[in-house]
């Protein structure tokens, strides 16, 4: 999991969804740096079925090192914003650097409503399965039609490749 914001929240949410059915490890807290990622990877044991790691950067050429350690097969980018922008010349440069984590993934998941991310994904031509989610475009593979917030839960209604469901 990478992005400017929301990495830890998404990682924890995925862990809560996957952990009951799979032997899953995750990076502790916000261990997403050159030091934190190797410490996180050490948790993988012989019985681990899934591992969820977050990767964060603050300057160019950092993500390739994290990609070599994590070697993700499925990647997710949350968003691109101004956080840690001082190390980059442009926000596009930062987006491309973050997407370096996903270069060898079998599948990448990203915000299909974010023009910058879409442009960078297209520019990099990953050649893997892409799942773009959207709250605006019903033609995206994953269309989120409704979010209902309750007192103790949130229900998300979605359509994935013509299959309608909710979580």
Predicted features along the sequence, with ranges:
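Phosphate-binding loop of NTP-binding sites
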Residues: 1-128
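Adenine nucleotide phosphate-binding catalytic loops in nucleotide-utilizing enzymes
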Residues: 92, 127-167
